[in-house]
């Protein structure tokens, strides 16, 4: 099978991937961007983004990622669905295999694969994923309506999830390792003043 040759290959479609695509396209590098398993990245599961410049009233993660996607397309980014499954980065041109079948040779590769939810590593945790264990309040929050729930973590993501769930659940416990929260002050205040 002959490899497709491209100037610039971007792997990942979160904010970093789309931003790289916008700049690469404006520089006439004809970027090809593979969106991965979750087009738009982890931000698509976030309800309110309030700390990104340019959105004074805040914006949903889905809307923000749609905006970035459209902007990347507007400048000529070739957006494709697929997952990088192998890489040979030993010399240029770099070779990336997509979905274990298509090989792409790229002069430049930008890897923007982003983040994924962290699990605790408890026994049977993955077994109960989607059946009481969740890593996405906006995805699964409806199932916990009027129930007692617990969120593990003390950072912004955990506090945002707890705040969202407080609108659905009867009670929300925030479980943290340390005697303090690591979240931004505004998120701490929001969580602490909610009676749930």
Whereabouts are the PLM-identified features?
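FAD-binding core/adjacent interface of flavoenzyme oxidoreductases
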Residues: 1-11, 32, 77-147
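Rossmann-like dinucleotide/flavin-binding elements
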Residues: 2-5, 10-36, 129, 135-184
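Short, glycine/charged-enriched secondary-structure capping and boundary segments
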Residues: 24-25, 46-49, 123-127, 164-167, ...
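N-terminal glycine-rich anion-binding loops that anchor highly charged ligand groups
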Residues: 33-45
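A generic "binding-loop/recognition-motif" signal
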Residues: 39, 48, 83, 115-116, ...
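Active-site loop signature of alpha/beta-hydrolase-fold enzymes
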Residues: 39-40, 87, 118, 180-181
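N-terminal Rossmann-like dinucleotide/flavin-binding domain of flavoprotein oxidoreductases
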Residues: 44-103, 184-196
């Amino acid at each position: 099978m002959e490899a497709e040759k491209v100037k610039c290959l971007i792997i990942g479609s979160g904010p970093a991937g789309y931003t790289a695509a916008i700049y690469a396209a404006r520089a006439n590098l004809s970027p090809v961007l593979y969106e991965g398993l979750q087009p738009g990245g982890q931000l698509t599961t976030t309800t309110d983004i309030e700390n990104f410049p340019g959105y004074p009233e805040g914006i949903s993660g889905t809307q923000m990622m749609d905006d970035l996607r459209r902007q990347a397309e507007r400048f000529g980014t070739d957006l494709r669905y697929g997952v990088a499954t192998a890489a040979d980065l030993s010399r240029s041109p770099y070779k990336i295999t997509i979905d274990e079948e298509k090989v792409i040779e790229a002069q430049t590769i930008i890897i923007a694969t982003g983040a994924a939810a962290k699990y605790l590593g408890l026994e049977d945790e993955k077994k109960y994923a989607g059946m009481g264990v969740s890593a996405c309040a906006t995805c699964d929050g409806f199932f916990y309506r009027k129930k007692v729930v617990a969120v593990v973590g003390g950072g912004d993501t955990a506090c945002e999830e707890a705040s969202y769930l407080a609108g659905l659940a009867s009670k929300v416990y925030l479980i943290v390792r340390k005697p303090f929260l690591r979240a931004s002050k505004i998120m701490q205040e929001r969580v602490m003043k909610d009676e749930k």
